[in-house]
Amino acid sequence: MSRTLVLVRHGQSEWNLKNLFTGWRDVDLTEQGHAEAKAAGQKLKARGLKFDIAFTSALSRAQKTCQHILDAVGQSDLKTIRDQALNERDYGDLSGLNKDDARKKWGEEQVHVWRRSYDVSPPGGESLKDTGARVWPYYLHDLQPHVLRGGTVLVAAHGNSLRALIMALDGKSGEEIVKLELGTGVPVIYQLNADSTVASKEVLEG
């Protein structure tokens, strides 16, 4: 039984490039982002991975990343579930703002707290804790059963929705998880035990 879970943050988006808060806004990948997603697929192909099912968010940057990966491994038509439970953290009133402009409006310290604290949310938005409150139950109910049946499951999503998953899988604290940097288009491969605990973890960087 493989019991394999592969997490991939979407490739660079147009708003990543412009240093804007993105959240639930639906923006496209950059040329570099498409290349990162294709490269992720090639890394997974080189490992000989074949997926039983794929999950992604309701946002096109994650969906396109997912499709690039499936194309690379020769599974373009694989069943793919799209659900907003895997969407990026909702940045509320910060969405669409340049991060430097947000610092000018609210102050460097306040914006830093909103971005890098675990349980403080920006106006009208979600904290990382809030994001985890929708991501983890979705994982337990919809994703994990496929893995525990011996499947190989792809999840193409976002920096903060994946942080929320990794926090629970790795047993990290809120303080630890906010410091975790997830590269765009970098696959993280988990092997799970039959009791759902983590047997191994590998990050395919470079």
UniProtKB/Swiss-Prot annotation:
Gene Ontology biological process terms, A to Z: gluconeogenesis; glycolytic process
SUPFAM superfamilies: Phosphoglycerate mutase-like (SSF53254)
Site features described as Transition state stabilizer, chain residue numbers: H158
UniProt keyword Isomerase present: yes
Any one GO MF annotation of this record: phosphoglycerate mutase activity
Pfam families to which the protein is assigned, alphabetical: His_Phos_1
InterPro entries linked to this entry: His_Pase_superF_clade-1, His_PPase_superfam, PG/BPGM_mutase_AS, Phosphogly_mut1
Residue numbers annotated as active site: H10, E88
Pathway this chain belongs to: Carbohydrate degradation; glycolysis; pyruvate from D-glyceraldehyde 3-phosphate: step 3/5
EC number(s) per entry: 5.4.2.11
Annotated substrate binding sites: 9-16, 22-23, 61, 88-91, 99, 115-116, 159-160
Reactions mediated catalytically: (2R)-2-phosphoglycerate = (2R)-3-phosphoglycerate
Alphabetic keyword roster: Gluconeogenesis, Glycolysis, Isomerase
Enzyme class, first EC level, given as a word: isomerase
Family according to the record: Belongs to the phosphoglycerate mutase family. BPG-dependent PGAM subfamily.
Role, per record: Catalyzes the interconversion of 2-phosphoglycerate and 3-phosphoglycerate.
Subunit and interaction comment: Homodimer.
Cross-referenced HAMAP family: PGAM_GpmA
Name used for this protein in its record: 2,3-bisphosphoglycerate-dependent phosphoglycerate mutase
Native organism taxonomy: Bacteria, Pseudomonadati, Pseudomonadota, Alphaproteobacteria, Hyphomicrobiales
